[in-house]
């Protein structure tokens, strides 16, 4: 069985020279969340270790402040949770 090779990805936070990730900025955080609001791993997002840890802390803070749900019911899963209706 062959391993799936992932393409080389670059950290978008490093390239954009972002100095701080705010937990209230959901547009920035949505790129590292799956459709079920789970935190995606570094190998899929391309984030560096430093920025992945900062994003995780920001997402956990946003969950604590009820800006992002902890869990999503299977029946309520949508394609993109951040689309405006």
Curated annotation (Swiss-Prot):
PROSITE patterns the UniProt entry points to: RIBOSOMAL_S18
Keyword set, alphabetical order: Ribonucleoprotein, Ribosomal protein, RNA-binding, rRNA-binding
Biological process per Gene Ontology, one example term: translation
Gene3D superfamilies associated with the record: Ribosomal protein S18 (4.10.640.10)
One matching Pfam family: Ribosomal_S18
InterPro entries linked: Ribosomal_bS18, Ribosomal_bS18_CS, Ribosomal_bS18_sf
GO MF annotation list: small ribosomal subunit rRNA binding; structural constituent of ribosome
GO cellular component term of the entry, any: cytosolic small ribosomal subunit
Assembly, per entry: Part of the 30S ribosomal subunit. Forms a tight heterodimer with protein bS6.
Family the entry assigns: Belongs to the bacterial ribosomal protein bS18 family.
Function: Binds as a heterodimer with protein bS6 to the central domain of the 16S rRNA, where it helps stabilize the platform of the 30S subunit.
NCBIfam families according to UniProt: S18
Listed name of the protein: Small ribosomal subunit protein bS18
Species per Swiss-Prot/TrEMBL record: Helicobacter pylori (strain G27)
Gene giving rise to this polypeptide: rpsR
């Amino acid at each position: 069985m062959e391993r799936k090779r992932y393409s080389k990805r670059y950290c978008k936070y490093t390239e954009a020279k972002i100095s701080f990730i705010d937990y209230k900025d959901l547009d920035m955080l949505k790129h590292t969340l799956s459709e079920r609001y789970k935190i995606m791993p570094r190998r899929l997002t391309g984030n560096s270790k430093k920025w992945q840890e900062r994003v995780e802390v920001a997402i956990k803070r946003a969950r604590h402040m009820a800006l992002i749900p902890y869990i999503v019911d299977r029946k309520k899963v949508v394609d993109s949770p951040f689309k405006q209706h």
